[in-house]
Amino acid sequence: MEPQQQQQQQGNEQQDSQGIGKINNGSGGSSFLCRQSSTRWTPTTDQIRILKDLYYNNGVRSPTAEQIQRISAKLRQYGKIEGKNVFYWFQNHKARERQKKRFTADHHHHMNVPTIHNHHYKPPPVYNKFSNMNSGSFPSSSNGSPGFLTTPGSHVGNYGYGSVAMEKSFRECTISSTTDANVGGSMSQNIAWIGINNEYHNPYTFIDTRKYMNGYDQTLEIEEEAEENYTAEIETLPLFPMHADIKQDTADYFNGRLENGCPRASLELTLNSWFGNSKYN
């Protein structure tokens, strides 16, 4: 019994001192098997320095069983160490390096994502289809397009017909205080057209718009002719319009003479005839 116990004790001591390894050539990798010990390894500063030098400078990432034995034999000069401690140190160091690279990649990815703040947000532009013009205001038109010019006491309403397209832009046509015109709404006194606002297009075709434009121009021409005729009639009326209803079929007596039908007699002759008729009546 004693020789068997001595042989078993010598085998255990030899295994602890040399750190017997087992190489798995079939899988292409290496694994190191050793007897587990209850004591925890506390590496010294020199041991850590040698291991980092092998890992970073010499490029040793996955050492084989022979390399682990040589490394552990060298490190025992600086403190207590086993072969399994060398094996696990390289495994843990590789895992930490992979985790560090993954964290760095995720950090750069989040840094490249643009962040949108509230002060960077710009609301879309809002265009008012129905423009209201207050009295005494001078609305400005963008992009050089002409608009309305209103004077105090005026009001223009637009009820969904869009902007009136005029062929002759910047055409002024003043309207008297007693004349009212409907151009998509109501227009009062002291309003002048100075242009058009082409910001919104007519939803109808160009042909319909052209017809409407021509009809509008013809309406303006008819109004101008009516104003000229009205002015001419005012100039030819007699000074006293109340005598215009007097019929000229009766005889007019003046200065001892008889004349029939004198529509354009002078004021003196008209008065004499009127007094003469009243005397005989």
UniProtKB/Swiss-Prot annotation:
The keyword Transcription regulation applies. InterPro entries: HD (IPR001356), Homeodomain-like_sf (IPR009057), WUSCHEL-like (IPR044555). Its main location: nucleus. Keywords: Developmental protein, Differentiation, DNA-binding, Flowering, Homeobox, Nucleus, Transcription, Transcription regulation. GO terms for molecular function: DNA binding; DNA-binding transcription factor activity. Residues 36-101 bind DNA. GO terms for biological process: cell differentiation; flower development; plant organ development. Residues 1-25 have a biased composition (Low complexity). SUPFAM superfamilies: Homeodomain-like. It is found in: Nucleus. Pfam families: Homeodomain. It comes from the Eukaryota. The keyword Cell division does not apply. One of its GO terms (cellular component) is nucleus. Signal peptide: none annotated. Residues 1-38 are annotated as: Disordered. Transcription factor that plays a central role during developmental processes such as early embryogenesis and flowering, probably by regulating expression of specific genes. Required to specify stem cell identity in meristems, such as shoot apical meristem (SAM). May induce shoot stem cells activity in order to maintain the stem cell identity. Belongs to the WUS homeobox family. PANTHER family: WUSCHEL-RELATED HOMEOBOX 1 (PTHR45940:SF2), WUSCHEL-RELATED HOMEOBOX 1-RELATED (PTHR45940). This is Protein WUSCHEL.
